Amino acid sequence: MLIEQPPKILRWLYPSALWRMDTNEKAVYLTFDDGPIPEITPWVLDLLDKYQIKATFFMVGDNVRKHPKEFQMVVERGHRVGNHTFNHIGGFRHLSYNYLENTNKADELIKSNLFRPPH
């Protein structure tokens, strides 16, 4: 089952991005958005460690720039990270060029094939 269909131009612009998952696999994907946040991210990581759970953190590039220590903690503890744009901008409220530029700026810091658009 595919819940959300991204615009085809995004697939063309980002061919190495992960666009689909095997839907026959029985799995739960735990995700967090908008981090890293110094007051919250370490607490979440400790809780995930306690229960031996891995998650994916969709990071805002500007937050990664401001809080590199917390970003590195997520990576070092074996969690996946994904791009959530640099300034958490929603695509429908911005010109395509500006949106892609903002996404690419975040990608310079995050370097992931995972992307979640902000709502």
Report residues per predicted region:
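Active-site beta->alpha N-cap acidic-glycine motif
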Residues: 2-92, 105, 109-112
